UniProtKB/Swiss-Prot annotation:
Keywords: ATP-binding, Cytoplasm, Disulfide bond, Nucleotide-binding, RNA-binding, Transferase, tRNA processing, tRNA-binding
GO biological process, one term: tRNA wobble position uridine thiolation
Residues annotated as the enzyme's active site: 100, 198
Annotated ATP binding sites: 9-16, 35, 124
Residues making up the signal peptide according to the UniProt record: none
Region (Interaction with tRNA): 148-150, 316-317
Catalytic activity: S-sulfanyl-L-cysteinyl-[protein] + uridine(34) in tRNA + AH2 + ATP = 2-thiouridine(34) in tRNA + L-cysteinyl-[protein] + A + AMP + diphosphate + H(+)
Gene this chain is encoded by: mnmA
EC number: 2.8.1.13
Record-annotated disulphide pairs: 100-198
Similarity-based family: Belongs to the MnmA/TRMU family.
Protein name: tRNA-specific 2-thiouridylase MnmA
GO CC, one annotated term: cytoplasm
MF GO annotations: ATP binding; tRNA binding; tRNA-uridine 2-sulfurtransferase activity
Length: 370
């Protein structure tokens, strides 16, 4: 195995810690970098960056590597957070983790690592990279642990980025990662996984978004046009949402709806022109199901779109691959047709294409059709 100078993104979590350990065990020259990418709430109870850095520094000490603290807050706010807000203001539901990976972890961080003389970078993502011997192209593969696979969030990476990237824990299951961490005495072996917005942390989302986006309350209507209540602003809702609608006590009587007295309500549409939130009763309501989507701002790992034909796709993280047909893929736009109806396909989220375990790339969902 060729030995490299590898810069590892140490987040303070167990996955990146084991990543650094494995690389050092393989004989690589390993340096750690802790990225601070959000500083608006440094004194907030929800900001964990101080503790995360202390955890990362403790890990570096146990493993025996140097660690550097680097601030990418300006880049994050300009390249990721500004787009995140624009999408919400346009009534869509963005996925900041996808953009953060493409713009910060595998661009700003990669560039910084190269300036430090790195030959490779590594992160604790559950994914894999291989070079196809027939084409010479680098491929992004799903992580071996299906419950932790993060290729969905990495689908915007390109050939240059993948050629410089290592994902050591992509060949492991999470239980193995925690066992390794415990065996070598890492102080964060039992630290829980983070689940908040990329780099912003775990905080009440509506309260957080309210600080940055103007909101206009409006009516909540059902599929018949009946008024059920008022929403607090369309930006605060996403398609398929069930909790937090404030209409839990409004139940439709009668069997004619086919949903029953106590069937839950789901967000089905956001009508920006009239500032109206549309909700429907029942998980399988036709308004929640679609067979086709159109996507834009596509990025293809091989550098070109896949040919029209049979494929598989995810329209949300952790979703099982859904069989589909690529109807057209030209430039940065493509369309998919699904033989089985997909539930709550959401504009702003990513549609990511797969050929078996190989991630082909994807784009941002722009429109859906029944």
């Amino acid at each position: 195995m060729t030995k490299h100078r590898v810069v590892v993104g140490l987040s303070g979590g167990v996955d990146s810690a084991v990543t650094a350990h494995l690389l050092k065990q393989q004989g690589h020259e390993v340096v750690g970098i802790f990225m601070k990418n959000w500083e608006d709430d440094d004194d907030s109870e929800f900001c964990s960056s101080r503790q995360d850095f202390l955890d990362a520094a403790s890990v570096a000490d146990v493993i025996g590597i140097e660690i550097e603290h680097v601030n990418f807050a300006a880049e994050y706010k300009d390249r990721v957070f500004a787009e995140f807000l624009r999408e919400y203001q346009a009534g869509r539901t963005p996925n900041p983790d996808v953009l953060c990976n493409a713009e910060i972890k595998f661009k700003a961080f990669l560039d910084h690592a190269m300036r430090l003389g790195a030959e490779k970078i590594a992160t604790g993502h559950y994914a894999r990279v291989r070079q196809n011997p027939a084409t010479g192209l680098f491929e992004l593969l799903k992580g071996l642990d299906p419950s932790k696979d993060q290729s969905y969030f990495l689908h915007r990476l390109n050939q240059a980025q993948l050629s410089k990237t290592l994902f050591p824990v992509g060949d492991l299951h999470k239980t193995e990662v925690r066992r390794i961490a415990a065996d070598i005495g890492l102080p964060n072996a039992k630290k829980k996984d983070s689940t908040g917005i990329c780099f912003i942390g775990e905080r009440p989302f509506r309260e957080f978004l309210n600080r940055y986006i103007q909101h206009a309350p409006g009516p909540i209507l059902d599929d018949r046009g009946r008024k059920l209540g008022r929403h607090v602003g369309l930006s605060f809702y996403t398609l398929g949402q069930r909790q937090g609608l404030g209409i839990g006590g409004v139940k439709e009587k009668g069997a004619q709806r086919g949903a029953g007295d106590h069937a839950p309500w789901f967000v089905a549409r956001k009508e920006l022109e009239t500032n109206t939130l549309r909700v429907v009763q029942g998980h399988e309501h036709p308004w929640l199901l679609s067979h086709r989507l159109d996507a834009q701002d596509a990025s293809w790992i091989a550098g070109h779109p896949p040919a029209a034909g049979a494929c598989a796709a995810k329209t949300r993280y952790r979703q099982q691959d859904a069989a589909c047909t690529v109807l057209a893929a030209q430039g940065d736009a493509f369309s998919l047709q699904f033989p089985e109806a997909q539930w709550a396909v959401t504009p702003g989220q990513s549609a990511v294409l797969y050929d078996g375990e190989v991630c082909l790339g994807g784009g941002v969902i722009a429109a859906v059709n029944g």
